[in-house]
Amino acid sequence: MAVLKMPRFKKYHLRLMITCFSTLLLMTYWEKIDNCVVTHVMSFSYRYLFNSFKFINSSFIVNPEDAIKYNHRYLINHQTKCDNKDILLLLFVKSSSENFERRQAIRSTWGNETYIESTLGVTVKVLFALGLHPIPEERGKLKEDLMFEDQKYRDLIQQDFIDTFHNLTLKLLLQLGWKETYCHHAQFLMSADDDVFVHTPNLILYLQGFGQSNTRDLWIGGVHRGSPPNRDKESKYYVSRDLYPWLSYPDYTPGSGYVLSRDVVSRIYQASLTINASFHIDDVFLGICAKMMDVSPTDHAFFSGEGKAPHHHCIYSLMMTSHGHVSDIHEMWRHARNAEDVLISSGLFRRLYCTAVKVRLLCVPFFSNSYPCKAAFFEEDT
């Protein structure tokens, strides 16, 4: 009998060891599991079941006296940049003082105002939004370089806040305030990072499709819905529960690239004057301001927030933005201007071919792509 009971005892012992090991493993990695899985489930539930963000009106309001501290002095400004112009798009590029080569690359490629006006037939104004270098010694060295650069190109807008990740909301306020004050008549505002490639031919064609000057309620980009606050203290995106105790952010578009119509800029700017700008994640801050004004973003499959677009003419023909481009920006611009890479000819075979290519490039399981899988089925007139 004892011989018969031994295997049963070993099986029980094995189950106990597996249970203990699993429990220990769960306890060890619970914070990561919580951040990656549980918080997303909770935030999505909050977003889609409750969808209540009434707290914004009470918790984020600041009085005018406190709001003044977020107004910063212009060190470099061009008040007449938009004078006497019928401007389709004001395009602000968020840059850092030391990123001269990135600005040069943009000026000679997708941000070339002369090319856009002569070839695409519209007026677009491109400006670079800057703060102060965080290191005082470097700040002094860069001051003269920036003055020389601006004398040549006349496209820098700088305020006297320290240019760090945790002050990106101040850079957003710079863009909104400058648009409202000096370029109110521009039909659209775009904000982009200086490592983003903007396919200006596609973007201009897309914006022209909305008509002349009466477009309203437009906020377009790659929309994040039901995103949870990051509670990992080691992350630069960390937000404490004291600062933001709720389970989900309002809908927002990544700061790497999005477009707002003139009326939306005005409404969000007015909201920003009454909301606590110490919230340092600029794209979420934009979403909070927009929610307060009852403005919702529209998702566009080819606005990239996460990474580089795959190289293929079936992608270039629909691309709006692609993130993470510095060394290859000239190659991207060559493709953007190449009619073979830009135009999808009519015909069922070509459409089927490009759909198959996009499925292969964008719908890879367990792989983070620049565009979502649904972009594979995106059409030009969508």
UniProtKB/Swiss-Prot annotation:
Topology within the bilayer: Single-pass type II membrane protein
Q: Which reaction does it catalyse?
A: a beta-D-Gal-(1->4)-beta-D-Glc-(1<->1)-Cer(d18:1(4E)) + UDP-N-acetyl-alpha-D-glucosamine = a beta-D-GlcNAc-(1->3)-beta-D-Gal-(1->4)-beta-D-Glc-(1<->1)-Cer(d18:1(4E)) + UDP + H(+); a neolactoside nLc4Cer(d18:1(4E)) + UDP-N-acetyl-alpha-D-glucosamine = a neolactoside IV(3)-beta-GlcNAc-nLc4Cer(d18:1(4E)) + UDP + H(+)
Pathway listed for it is: Protein modification; protein glycosylation
Question: Could you list the residue ranges that cross the membrane?
Answer: 14-30
User: Which GO terms of type biological process are on file?
Assistant: protein O-linked glycosylation
User: Any keyword Glycosyltransferase?
Assistant: yes
Where do the record's glycosylation annotations fall on this chain?
N57, N112, N167, N276
Cellular compartments per GO CC: Golgi membrane
Protein's name in the database: Lactosylceramide 1,3-N-acetyl-beta-D-glucosaminyltransferase B
